[in-house]
Regions:
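A non-transmembrane, solvent-exposed segment enriched in polar/low-complexity residues
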Residues: 17-173, 186
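Bacterial Sec-dependent N-terminal signal peptides
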Residues: 1-27, 443
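Short, internal strand/loop/helix patches
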Residues: 400-436
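N-terminal targeting signals for export/organelle localization
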Residues: 253-324
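Non-catalytic, surface beta->alpha helical segment in thiol-disulfide oxidoreductase systems
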Residues: 427-430, 436-456
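Short active-site neighborhood of thiol/selenol oxidoreductases, capturing the structured segment around
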Residues: 341-372, 385
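Structural microenvironment flanking redox-active thiols in thiol-disulfide oxidoreductases
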Residues: 363-403, 415-419
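N-terminal "domain-start" segment that seeds a small globular fold
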Residues: 309-344, 406-407
Length: 456
């Protein structure tokens, strides 16, 4: 992937970092190029900390007096990125929303650890593409490749650590970023290829587990660690006679994962985070909806976080409202005149397909429009309504006009958090099929599904 190289901004506020005075505050600021909205949100542990507004030049900044050391997420719809903050940090970031992850550059106190994390994340994506062709190798050859990559990252980490005065916590986090990523790849290989391994093969292959910790309370909300633990739980839950990609679709498989969490994970926060992730995997598998009441009984027994419980139950109930025959839940949207209207107003007594797109993912948008054109030829009686997940502006309206789209069929979401909850918008390839009365035919269709035409 191409990387944008930005000129790093240094603000006057950083001059205060030169003083030999202990500072327990955390400063966070920066600039977003080509923003998709007028704000970004700071999260911790899946809870909103603050909403940071962009000024007329798309800058934001705020000093926090009581933030703890740990992992935070900055969200600029539809993108987000994890950052690691500690008291005394004065972190600036610059990002182009069109190439969000690839363009992030940090500067200021606390930048070295975060630049290491983002570059590690980007290189992991490149390596994963390379490794996708290596899963056919024997396990010893695959392990050798991973060992080589681990050594390379370890040397990069040593170099970074040697020129920065990192805290013990920051050292642990930056090291864990690559250690658990590669451990995760090993677990994934085992899920795909390890069904018929002998005990001696398993013992040799899984020896890396002896160096890992399954009770990392400091990493309980760190994505590389959680991703590893989820694949580890999957490997532990998979019977030798089962095929992973088929088995993981079953509710019983996720119940088994919950039971392993309950019986083997002691730390409450880690246990709740793992259970929440498993619950989302299951509840968002719409084909299993009839079995979710049973699944939730097991989830209730494992989870002790009331907020997570409310989230999962709310998601389950919102999915019910999107079932076949239901009336599409009402949200407020923006029309091409930039007026706010009710979503009920887009209905016009014609069967309708609603599709979604993002102003920061134009390649996806073009692919979607090509699919829509093909469907139009075979199903001319349908109306096709495009909804941007960010509010419209004059530039977007101009682009849609250049693409030959009827502005009467183009709308935008005003409050993504509310809309994504009510309409269960988790992926941009989601589409909603309505009959001529506005009732739901399929609330969870995939616009790129080859079987979509058969539903119309």
């Amino acid at each position: 992937m191409n990387k944008f190289k930005f000129f790093i901004l240094f603000a006057i506020v950083f001059s205060s970092c030169k003083k030999e005075v202990k500072n327990n505050n955390i400063f966070l600021g920066g600039q977003i190029i080509n923003p998709s909205s007028s704000y970004l949100i700071l999260h911790k542990n899946n809870s909103t900390i603050d909403c940071l507004l962009l000024d007329s030049n798309n800058f934001f900044q705020k000093k926090f007096n009581n933030l703890e050391s740990g992992f935070y997420k900055i969200e600029h719809i539809p993108e987000y990125q994890t950052i690691f903050l500690e008291p005394g940090d004065s972190l600036w970031l610059r990002v182009n929303a069109v190439e969000f992850k690839q363009s992030i550059v940090y500067s200021g106190k606390g930048s070295s650890k975060n630049n290491f994390l983002i570059q590690n994340d980007i290189s992991n994506e490149i390596e994963n593409e390379f490794l996708s062709s290596k899963y056919s190798l024997k396990n010893n050859l695959f392990s050798n490749i991973i060992d080589s990559l681990v050594l390379q990252k370890k040397n990069q980490w040593k170099n970074m650590d040697s020129i920065n005065n990192l805290s013990k916590y920051a050292q642990k986090v930056t090291m864990a970023a690559y250690v658990y990523n590669y451990a995760n790849l090993r677990e994934r290989y085992a899920l795909l290829r390890g069904a018929n391994w002998s005990q001696s093969e398993k013992k040799k292959y899984f020896k890396y587990r002896y160096f890992l910790n399954f009770e990392e309370t400091d990493l309980s909300s760190f994505d590389p660690y959680i991703d590893y633990m989820l694949n580890y739980l999957s490997e532990q839950s998979l019977d030798s006679s089962n095929y992973y990609f088929k088995t993981k679709q079953n509710t019983d498989f996720n119940i088994k994962r919950l039971k392993i969490v309950e019986n083997n994970i002691i730390g409450r926060e880690l246990k709740n985070n793992l259970a929440r992730a498993i619950a989302y995997d299951e509840i968002l598998n719409f084909d299993n909806h009839s079995q979710h009441e049973n699944f939730l009984q097991y989830y209730f027994a494992v989870n002790s976080n009331t907020r997570f419980l409310g989230e999962v139950l709310s998601l389950h109930n919102d999915i019910k409202k999107m079932n076949v025959g239901s009336i599409l839940p009402r949200i407020f949207i923006q029309n091409s005149k930039l007026d706010t209207i009710s979503s009920n107003e887009i209905l016009n007594k014609k069967p309708t397909i609603i599709y979604f797109w993002s102003q920061t993912q134009m390649n996806q948008y073009r692919k979607t429009l090509k699919v829509i054109e093909k469907i139009k030829i075979k199903k001319p009686e349908y109306r096709f309504v495009g909804i941007s997940i960010q509010p419209l502006n004059k530039m977007v309206l101009k682009v849609n006009k250049m693409l030959g789209l009827d502005k009467k069929d183009q709308y935008a979401i005003i409050n993504f958090e509310n809309a994504s909850k009510k309409w269960i918008i988790t992926l941009l390839n989601k589409s909603i099929i309505l009959d001529s009365n506005g009732n739901i035919v399929n609330g969870f269709a995939n616009i790129f599904d080859l079987e979509l035409l058969n539903e119309l």
